Curated annotation (Swiss-Prot):
The keyword Hydrolase applies. This is Probable allantoicase. Its EC number is 3.5.3.4. Keywords: Hydrolase, Purine metabolism. It comes from the Bacteria. InterPro entries: Allantoicase, Allantoicase_dom, Galactose-bd-like_sf. It comes from Pseudomonas paraeruginosa (strain DSM 24068 / PA7). It catalyses: allantoate + H2O = (S)-ureidoglycolate + urea. It holds the Pfam family Allantoicase. The lineage of its organism: Bacteria, Pseudomonadati, Pseudomonadota, Gammaproteobacteria, Pseudomonadales.
Amino acid sequence: MNADHAPFRHYLDLADARLGSQVVAVSDEWFAPASRMLQAGEPVWKEGVFDDSGKWMDGWETRRKRFEGHDQAVIRLGVSGVLKGVDIDTRFFTGNHPPAASLDGCFCAEGDPDDGTSWSEVLPSVELQGDRHHYHAIDDERPWTHLRLNIYPDGGIARLRVYGVPYRDWRSQTPGTALDLAAAINGGRALACSDQHFGPMVNLLKPGRALNMGDGWETGRRRTPGHDWAIIALGHPGSIEAAVVDTLHFKGNYPESCSIQAAFVEDGNEARIEAQSLFWRELLPAQKLEMHHEHRFERQLNALGPVSHVRLNIFPDGGVSRLRLFGRPQLP
Protein backbone atom coordinates (compact mmCIF):
# COMPACT_ATOMS: atom_id res chain seq x y z
CA MET A 1 0.00 0.00 0.00
CA ASN A 2 1.39 3.42 -0.92
CA ALA A 3 0.71 6.75 0.75
CA ASP A 4 -2.01 7.70 -1.73
CA HIS A 5 -3.99 4.62 -0.71
CA ALA A 6 -3.52 5.05 3.04
CA PRO A 7 -6.41 7.33 4.11
CA PHE A 8 -5.85 6.40 7.75
CA ARG A 9 -2.89 8.81 7.79
CA HIS A 10 -5.44 11.53 8.52
CA TYR A 11 -5.92 10.05 11.99
CA LEU A 12 -3.78 10.89 15.01
CA ASP A 13 -0.45 9.10 15.44
CA LEU A 14 -1.10 7.49 18.82
CA ALA A 15 2.58 6.49 19.14
CA ASP A 16 3.88 10.06 18.80
CA ALA A 17 6.36 10.81 21.58
CA ARG A 18 4.82 14.28 21.91
CA LEU A 19 1.68 12.61 23.27
CA GLY A 20 3.74 10.92 25.97
CA SER A 21 4.25 7.60 24.18
CA GLN A 22 7.22 5.66 25.57
CA VAL A 23 9.11 2.44 25.01
CA VAL A 24 8.69 0.56 28.30
CA ALA A 25 10.49 -2.68 27.38
CA VAL A 26 12.87 -3.70 24.61
CA SER A 27 14.80 -6.88 23.87
CA ASP A 28 17.82 -5.09 22.40
CA GLU A 29 18.83 -1.62 21.26
CA TRP A 30 22.55 -2.07 20.78
CA PHE A 31 23.00 0.24 17.80
CA ALA A 32 20.17 2.75 18.28
CA PRO A 33 17.50 3.28 20.98
CA ALA A 34 13.93 2.22 20.33
CA SER A 35 12.69 5.62 21.52
CA ARG A 36 13.82 7.15 18.23
CA MET A 37 11.04 5.26 16.42
CA LEU A 38 8.47 7.44 18.16
CA GLN A 39 9.92 10.84 17.27
CA ALA A 40 7.59 13.16 15.38
CA GLY A 41 10.16 14.35 12.84
CA GLU A 42 11.04 12.53 9.65
CA PRO A 43 14.10 10.25 9.86
CA VAL A 44 17.39 11.69 8.60
CA TRP A 45 20.65 10.29 7.27
CA LYS A 46 23.93 11.58 8.71
CA GLU A 47 26.73 10.71 6.35
CA GLY A 48 29.91 9.56 8.06
CA VAL A 49 28.56 9.94 11.61
CA PHE A 50 29.48 7.14 14.03
CA ASP A 51 29.09 6.67 17.77
CA ASP A 52 30.53 4.13 20.21
CA SER A 53 28.19 1.41 18.91
CA GLY A 54 28.75 1.97 15.19
CA LYS A 55 27.02 3.93 12.43
CA TRP A 56 24.55 6.46 13.84
CA MET A 57 21.04 5.63 12.66
CA ASP A 58 17.84 7.61 13.15
CA GLY A 59 15.62 4.84 14.47
CA TRP A 60 15.70 1.63 16.50
CA GLU A 61 18.42 -0.84 15.58
CA THR A 62 19.30 -4.12 17.29
CA ARG A 63 22.48 -6.15 17.00
CA ARG A 64 22.76 -9.17 14.71
CA LYS A 65 21.02 -12.08 16.39
CA ARG A 66 23.20 -15.21 16.82
CA PHE A 67 20.59 -17.39 18.53
CA GLU A 68 16.93 -18.33 18.19
CA GLY A 69 14.14 -15.83 18.66
CA HIS A 70 13.40 -12.29 17.52
CA ASP A 71 13.56 -8.74 18.83
CA GLN A 72 10.64 -6.75 20.16
CA ALA A 73 9.77 -3.40 21.70
CA VAL A 74 6.79 -2.68 23.96
CA ILE A 75 5.29 0.80 23.59
CA ARG A 76 2.96 2.52 26.01
CA LEU A 77 0.74 4.75 23.90
CA GLY A 78 0.45 8.33 25.10
CA VAL A 79 -3.24 8.09 24.27
CA SER A 80 -5.03 4.74 24.20
CA GLY A 81 -7.13 4.20 21.13
CA VAL A 82 -8.56 2.14 18.29
CA LEU A 83 -6.10 1.58 15.46
CA LYS A 84 -6.98 2.39 11.85
CA GLY A 85 -3.60 1.77 10.26
CA VAL A 86 0.16 1.63 10.79
CA ASP A 87 3.32 2.63 8.95
CA ILE A 88 6.44 0.59 9.64
CA ASP A 89 9.08 2.88 8.16
CA THR A 90 12.53 1.50 7.27
CA ARG A 91 13.93 4.58 5.56
CA PHE A 92 17.76 4.64 5.45
CA PHE A 93 17.92 1.06 6.71
CA THR A 94 19.30 -0.96 3.80
CA GLY A 95 21.04 -4.25 4.44
CA ASN A 96 20.16 -3.91 8.11
CA HIS A 97 16.34 -3.85 7.98
CA PRO A 98 14.21 -6.75 9.31
CA PRO A 99 12.75 -9.06 6.64
CA ALA A 100 9.41 -9.09 8.50
CA ALA A 101 7.50 -7.54 11.40
CA SER A 102 4.23 -7.96 13.30
CA LEU A 103 2.27 -6.02 15.89
CA ASP A 104 0.44 -7.13 19.05
CA GLY A 105 -1.74 -5.12 21.42
CA CYS A 106 -3.08 -5.22 24.96
CA PHE A 107 -5.27 -3.04 27.18
CA CYS A 108 -3.96 -2.33 30.67
CA ALA A 109 -6.32 -0.20 32.73
CA GLU A 110 -3.41 0.58 35.04
CA GLY A 111 0.34 0.24 34.70
CA ASP A 112 2.32 -1.61 32.08
CA PRO A 113 2.05 -5.23 30.86
CA ASP A 114 3.91 -7.99 32.68
CA ASP A 115 4.63 -11.68 32.10
CA GLY A 116 0.99 -12.52 32.80
CA THR A 117 -0.48 -10.06 30.30
CA SER A 118 -2.53 -11.50 27.45
CA TRP A 119 -1.58 -10.07 24.04
CA SER A 120 -3.72 -10.05 20.89
CA GLU A 121 -2.51 -9.96 17.31
CA VAL A 122 -3.13 -6.58 15.69
CA LEU A 123 -1.08 -6.98 12.52
CA PRO A 124 0.09 -10.42 11.39
CA SER A 125 3.63 -10.85 10.14
CA VAL A 126 4.23 -8.72 7.04
CA GLU A 127 7.21 -8.55 4.71
CA LEU A 128 9.49 -5.53 4.98
CA GLN A 129 11.86 -3.99 2.47
CA GLY A 130 14.66 -1.55 3.09
CA ASP A 131 14.39 2.22 2.87
CA ARG A 132 10.63 2.55 2.45
CA HIS A 133 7.24 3.05 4.11
CA HIS A 134 5.04 0.03 4.81
CA TYR A 135 1.39 1.07 5.20
CA HIS A 136 -1.13 -1.44 6.51
CA ALA A 137 -4.80 -0.80 7.33
CA ILE A 138 -6.15 -2.22 10.61
CA ASP A 139 -9.75 -3.44 10.88
CA ASP A 140 -10.23 -3.94 14.62
CA GLU A 141 -12.47 -1.94 16.95
CA ARG A 142 -10.72 -2.91 20.17
CA PRO A 143 -8.86 -0.12 22.01
CA TRP A 144 -5.24 -0.62 23.04
CA THR A 145 -3.03 0.99 25.66
CA HIS A 146 0.18 -0.83 24.68
CA LEU A 147 1.62 -2.23 21.47
CA ARG A 148 4.39 -4.76 20.95
CA LEU A 149 6.39 -4.44 17.75
CA ASN A 150 8.06 -7.70 16.76
CA ILE A 151 10.86 -7.70 14.17
CA TYR A 152 12.11 -10.95 12.66
CA PRO A 153 14.80 -11.68 13.55
CA ASP A 154 16.62 -8.37 14.12
CA GLY A 155 17.52 -5.10 12.39
CA GLY A 156 16.39 -1.50 12.24
CA ILE A 157 13.13 0.48 12.06
CA ALA A 158 13.27 4.23 11.44
CA ARG A 159 9.76 5.17 12.57
CA LEU A 160 6.60 3.45 13.79
CA ARG A 161 3.45 5.45 13.10
CA VAL A 162 0.25 4.15 14.67
CA TYR A 163 -2.80 5.97 13.31
CA GLY A 164 -6.07 5.73 15.17
CA VAL A 165 -8.93 7.24 17.14
CA PRO A 166 -8.24 8.04 20.80
CA TYR A 167 -10.35 6.08 23.24
CA ARG A 168 -12.21 8.07 25.87
CA ASP A 169 -14.84 6.81 28.26
CA TRP A 170 -17.22 9.75 28.11
CA ARG A 171 -19.37 8.16 30.82
CA SER A 172 -16.59 8.90 33.30
CA GLN A 173 -16.42 12.57 32.29
CA THR A 174 -17.39 14.91 35.12
CA PRO A 175 -20.66 16.63 34.12
CA GLY A 176 -20.26 20.31 33.32
CA THR A 177 -16.51 20.13 32.70
CA ALA A 178 -15.35 22.09 29.65
CA LEU A 179 -12.64 20.70 27.37
CA ASP A 180 -11.39 20.99 23.80
CA LEU A 181 -13.96 18.96 21.90
CA ALA A 182 -12.05 19.29 18.61
CA ALA A 183 -8.72 18.01 19.95
CA ALA A 184 -7.46 14.84 18.33
CA ILE A 185 -6.65 13.41 21.76
CA ASN A 186 -10.36 13.76 22.59
CA GLY A 187 -11.43 12.05 19.38
CA GLY A 188 -11.72 15.06 17.08
CA ARG A 189 -11.28 14.22 13.38
CA ALA A 190 -10.50 16.28 10.29
CA LEU A 191 -12.93 15.00 7.63
CA ALA A 192 -12.54 17.14 4.53
CA CYS A 193 -11.07 20.37 3.25
CA SER A 194 -10.89 22.47 0.11
CA ASP A 195 -7.09 22.28 -0.13
CA GLN A 196 -4.09 21.15 1.92
CA HIS A 197 -1.25 21.77 -0.49
CA PHE A 198 1.36 22.86 2.06
CA GLY A 199 0.09 21.34 5.32
CA PRO A 200 -2.52 18.65 6.12
CA MET A 201 -5.78 19.55 7.84
CA VAL A 202 -5.15 16.94 10.55
CA ASN A 203 -2.49 19.26 11.98
CA LEU A 204 -5.22 21.64 13.17
CA LEU A 205 -6.20 19.21 15.93
CA LYS A 206 -2.77 18.19 17.21
CA PRO A 207 -1.85 18.76 20.87
CA GLY A 208 0.25 21.75 21.88
CA ARG A 209 1.15 24.71 19.72
CA ALA A 210 2.71 24.12 16.32
CA LEU A 211 6.43 23.38 16.10
CA ASN A 212 6.82 25.29 12.84
CA MET A 213 4.88 26.39 9.77
CA GLY A 214 4.84 22.84 8.43
CA ASP A 215 3.02 21.68 11.56
CA GLY A 216 -0.19 23.48 10.64
CA TRP A 217 -2.85 23.46 7.91
CA GLU A 218 -1.90 25.56 4.89
CA THR A 219 -3.60 25.85 1.52
CA GLY A 220 -2.15 26.86 -1.83
CA ARG A 221 -2.52 30.40 -3.11
CA ARG A 222 -6.07 30.81 -4.38
CA ARG A 223 -6.22 32.10 -7.97
CA THR A 224 -9.99 31.69 -8.39
CA PRO A 225 -13.01 33.18 -6.59
CA GLY A 226 -14.03 31.64 -3.28
CA HIS A 227 -12.30 30.70 -0.05
CA ASP A 228 -10.80 27.68 1.69
CA TRP A 229 -12.41 25.57 4.41
CA ALA A 230 -11.97 22.50 6.61
CA ILE A 231 -14.64 20.29 8.22
CA ILE A 232 -14.06 18.84 11.69
CA ALA A 233 -16.00 16.16 13.56
CA LEU A 234 -15.92 16.82 17.30
CA GLY A 235 -14.81 14.03 19.59
CA HIS A 236 -18.19 14.30 21.28
CA PRO A 237 -21.22 16.55 20.68
CA GLY A 238 -21.31 19.58 22.93
CA SER A 239 -22.03 23.28 23.31
CA ILE A 240 -19.09 25.45 22.22
CA GLU A 241 -18.21 28.26 24.62
CA ALA A 242 -14.83 29.39 23.26
CA ALA A 243 -12.92 29.07 19.99
CA VAL A 244 -9.19 29.50 19.48
CA VAL A 245 -7.78 30.09 15.99
CA ASP A 246 -3.99 30.07 16.15
CA THR A 247 -1.87 31.44 13.29
CA LEU A 248 1.47 30.74 15.00
CA HIS A 249 4.36 30.76 12.47
CA PHE A 250 2.10 32.04 9.68
CA LYS A 251 3.21 35.59 8.87
CA GLY A 252 3.12 36.44 5.16
CA ASN A 253 0.65 33.64 4.53
CA TYR A 254 -2.04 33.87 7.21
CA PRO A 255 -5.74 34.28 6.28
CA GLU A 256 -7.20 37.77 6.25
CA SER A 257 -10.19 36.54 8.27
CA CYS A 258 -12.09 33.44 9.34
CA SER A 259 -15.55 32.25 10.34
CA ILE A 260 -16.95 29.02 11.79
CA GLN A 261 -20.19 27.22 10.98
CA ALA A 262 -21.57 24.31 13.02
CA ALA A 263 -24.31 21.69 13.07
CA PHE A 264 -25.51 18.59 14.86
CA VAL A 265 -25.08 15.85 12.23
CA GLU A 266 -26.91 12.59 12.74
CA ASP A 267 -24.96 9.34 12.42
CA GLY A 268 -24.48 8.08 8.89
CA ASN A 269 -24.63 11.43 7.15
CA GLU A 270 -20.90 12.20 6.96
CA ALA A 271 -20.72 10.96 3.35
CA ARG A 272 -22.66 14.03 2.21
CA ILE A 273 -21.16 16.41 4.70
CA GLU A 274 -19.31 18.70 2.29
CA ALA A 275 -22.50 19.81 0.54
CA GLN A 276 -24.45 19.97 3.81
CA SER A 277 -21.87 22.20 5.47
CA LEU A 278 -22.67 25.10 3.13
CA PHE A 279 -25.95 25.55 5.00
CA TRP A 280 -24.80 25.09 8.59
CA ARG A 281 -25.56 27.80 11.11
CA GLU A 282 -23.00 30.45 11.96
CA LEU A 283 -21.14 29.78 15.20
CA LEU A 284 -18.52 32.50 14.74
CA PRO A 285 -19.19 35.44 12.39
CA ALA A 286 -16.27 36.56 10.22
CA GLN A 287 -13.36 37.84 12.33
CA LYS A 288 -10.15 39.58 11.31
CA LEU A 289 -6.98 37.60 11.92
CA GLU A 290 -3.42 38.66 12.68
CA MET A 291 -0.20 36.95 11.74
CA HIS A 292 1.62 34.66 14.19
CA HIS A 293 -1.07 35.12 16.85
CA GLU A 294 -3.41 33.05 19.01
CA HIS A 295 -6.94 34.44 18.65
CA ARG A 296 -9.51 33.55 21.31
CA PHE A 297 -13.20 34.17 20.69
CA GLU A 298 -15.90 33.91 23.36
CA ARG A 299 -18.35 36.82 23.28
CA GLN A 300 -18.35 36.67 19.49
CA LEU A 301 -19.84 33.14 19.45
CA ASN A 302 -23.50 32.50 18.77
CA ALA A 303 -25.29 30.18 21.20
CA LEU A 304 -26.25 27.22 19.01
CA GLY A 305 -26.61 24.54 21.66
CA PRO A 306 -25.05 21.10 21.14
CA VAL A 307 -23.20 20.57 17.84
CA SER A 308 -21.21 17.63 16.50
CA HIS A 309 -19.40 19.11 13.48
CA VAL A 310 -17.85 22.44 12.54
CA ARG A 311 -16.62 24.06 9.35
CA LEU A 312 -13.69 26.48 9.61
CA ASN A 313 -13.73 28.99 6.76
CA ILE A 314 -10.61 31.02 5.97
CA PHE A 315 -10.67 34.01 3.62
CA PRO A 316 -9.35 33.72 1.03
CA ASP A 317 -6.58 31.18 1.76
CA GLY A 318 -3.48 30.68 3.90
CA GLY A 319 -2.41 28.84 7.01
CA VAL A 320 -3.80 28.11 10.47
CA SER A 321 -1.70 26.13 12.92
CA ARG A 322 -4.35 25.05 15.46
CA LEU A 323 -8.11 25.14 16.01
CA ARG A 324 -9.43 24.73 19.56
CA LEU A 325 -13.14 24.47 20.39
CA PHE A 326 -13.79 24.49 24.11
CA GLY A 327 -17.17 23.38 25.34
CA ARG A 328 -19.17 21.11 27.58
CA PRO A 329 -19.91 17.67 26.14
CA GLN A 330 -23.51 16.60 25.89
CA LEU A 331 -23.39 13.56 28.16
CA PRO A 332 -26.05 10.80 28.44
